[in-house]
């Protein structure tokens, strides 16, 4: 592979964190969100995601807006919206097995939301406990807080608790 210049490699998305090194990561929406969203930054961050080999990128944002930009830059994506009114148990029962399948098939997965907040962090903690990577909810919460460098709030903790009620991963 040819050596590429710094700008050809793109820029790392804001709040990018590895959950499992070179396997699963999370970040803020490429380009930022709200008043901080920038089109050029979005493009540079999607280029970085592509250059790192992520496939697919899973967006949990309610709207599919801007996902077409990933298509234009050759990045495979999945839209799995997680709204404020979503039943957490139903959502996790569908999302977690799909994520496990992608990881088992050796896909390098990036999950993003509007921000690296309770929803993304809670999904991480949920996966850790549901998949059996962490033996208990408190251990999953503690590891998630270390991995994301943020404290889990009520929504994130509830997601982990709900994951404990689901049938365990096969």
Please annotate each region the language model reported.
Residues 117-123:
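Glycine-rich nucleophile elbow surrounding the catalytic serine of serine-hydrolase chemistry
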Residues 1-110, 123-170:
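Cys-dependent protein tyrosine phosphatase-like superfamily
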């Amino acid at each position: 592979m040819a050596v590429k210049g710094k700008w050809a490699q793109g820029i790392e998305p804001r709040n990018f964190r590895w959950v499992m090194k070179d396997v699963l990561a999370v970040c803020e929406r490429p380009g930022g969100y709200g008043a901080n969203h920038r089109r050029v930054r979005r493009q540079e961050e999607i280029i970085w995601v592509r250059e790192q080999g992520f496939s697919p990128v899973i967006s949990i944002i309610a709207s599919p807006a801007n996902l077409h930009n990933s298509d234009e830059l050759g990045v495979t994506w999945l839209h799995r919206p997680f709204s404020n009114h979503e039943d957490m148990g139903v959502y996790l029962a569908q999302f977690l097995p799909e994520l496990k399948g992608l990881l088992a098939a050796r896909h390098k997965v990036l999950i993003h939301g509007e921000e690296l907040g309770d929803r993304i962090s809670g999904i991480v903690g949920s996966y850790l406990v549901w998949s059996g990577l962490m033996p208990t909810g408190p251990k999953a919460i503690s590891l998630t807080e270390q991995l994301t460098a943020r404290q889990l709030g009520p929504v994130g903790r509830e997601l982990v608790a709900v994951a404990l009620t689901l049938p365990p991963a096969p």
